[in-house]
């Protein structure tokens, strides 16, 4: 019941590669563990990034079987490293669904429209460009060829620094043309001091700032320093709780927030 609060989860599942665990699980076993965890959490809206599959045609059947009662929107890009993308699951039936393809990138954003507590909302599930730098591989490469590694790392960072603001602008352009209230979630791959966060958090509440505690780190490899996953909600919403769930199915931690909607303010943004 939306009047009792809406529970939202955002989680970069890291392509089900389980990099931090000593357990030798296959991607399928890791995916099953993640889905079992999400099913147990029983959130109203679930936004996943870096959802990996070998067979895109089987994604809907797999999720429909494992997550009964959820409306499903997904899109995966086919790459030479496999098929991965975003998934949005909701207890509310979607009125409309779509995706925003980021230019020159396999990253993307999904959007889904719902009626929440009698009002129209659009949920954005975003995965913005990362630096594509593995800390463990970086350390190993520095030992072998310091200068070349520095050059390669600099090139990766420049590409990300250029692409991410453009991707943010694409989402903001869609928001500007959207008549509904908007909630922006996902893996921003950027810190709270960044352009990415500054632009997207304007006129929105950061659920961590409203109800979270501690540093709020969501990237486990640099805990407790790095918060790069967010749930941003309209100012009309009241944030009842925000939690970082320390499950190591991925190099990110899932974040979960419960919000309530105030019907007295009808301004859209």
Predicted regions located by residue number:
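Soluble or luminal CAZymes and related metallo-dependent hydrolases
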Residues: 26-30, 102-104, 156-170
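Active-site environment of divalent metal-dependent phosphoester hydrolases
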Residues: 15-18, 51-57, 79-83, 106, ...
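N-terminal, active-site-proximal structural segment of metallo-dependent hydrolase catalytic domains
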Residues: 1-62, 80, 168, 261-269
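Metal-dependent phosphoester-hydrolase catalytic domains
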Residues: 165-182, 188-269
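Active-site flanking residues adjacent to catalytic metal/cofactor-binding acidic residues
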Residues: 11, 49, 126, 185-187
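Structured beta-strand-rich core segments of catalytic domains in phosphoester-bond hydrolases
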Residues: 1-5, 45, 49-136, 243-247
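Residue-level detector of structured alpha->beta connecting loops
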Residues: 42, 91-93, 179, 236
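Acidic/histidine-rich helix-loop elements
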Residues: 10-29, 132-160
């Amino acid at each position: 019941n939306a009047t009792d609060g809406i529970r939202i989860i955002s989680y970069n599942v890291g392509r089900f590669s389980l990099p931090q665990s000593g357990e030798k699980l296959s991607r399928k076993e890791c995916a099953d563990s993640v889905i079992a965890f999400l099913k147990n959490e029983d959130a109203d809206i679930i936004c996943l990034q870096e959802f990996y599959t070998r067979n895109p045609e089987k994604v809907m059947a797999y999720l429909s079987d494992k997550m009964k009662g959820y409306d499903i929107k997904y899109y995966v890009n086919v790459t030479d490293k496999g098929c991965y993308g975003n998934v949005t699951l909701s207890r509310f039936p979607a009125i409309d669904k779509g995706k925003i393809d980021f230019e020159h990138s396999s990253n993307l954003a999904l959007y889904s429209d719902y009626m929440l507590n009698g009002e129209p909302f659009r949920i954005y599930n975003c995965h913005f460009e990362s630096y594509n730098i593995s800390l463990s591989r970086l350390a190993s490469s520095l030992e072998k060829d310091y200068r070349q590694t520095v050059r390669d790392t600099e090139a990766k960072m420049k590409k990300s620094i250029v692409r991410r603001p453009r991707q943010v602008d694409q989402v903001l352009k869609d928001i500007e043309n959207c008549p509904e209230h908007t909630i922006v979630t996902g893996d921003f791959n950027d810190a709270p001091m960044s352009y990415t966060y500054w632009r997207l958090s304007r006129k929105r509440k950061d659920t961590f700032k409203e109800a979270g505690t501690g540093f709020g780190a969501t990237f486990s490899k640099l805990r407790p320093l790095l918060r790069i996953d967010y749930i941003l909600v309209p100012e009309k919403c009241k944030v009842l709780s925000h939690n970082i769930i320390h499950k190591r199915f991925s190099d990110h931690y899932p974040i979960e927030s419960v919000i309530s909607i105030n019907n007295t303010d009808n301004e859209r943004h």
